Amino acid sequence: MTVTIECSEIQTKEDFHRLFTKSLYLPGFYGNNLDALHDCLTSLPQKTVINLVHTQALIRNLGPYGRAAIAAIAHAERENPERLTVNML
């Protein structure tokens, strides 16, 4: 599965989690926090490529939370390289 996420559309933490939940088909019990996102990304059932477009907008709009989100996603990629590829554009 390949997913493209337009980060400039994200204005709030809620937007971030809503968009990731929808784009990655995260389970209904997803906790809407970065720890839960990390857990989901490290246990993906299939090979997934995530293209994050305009990551600087995520940092600009969410500040430290945006930086933490990018760090969590990158960490998940390092832990699950056979199933997760992240391109930050």
Predicted feature descriptions by range:
Residues 1-89:
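Positively charged, polar, low-complexity stretches
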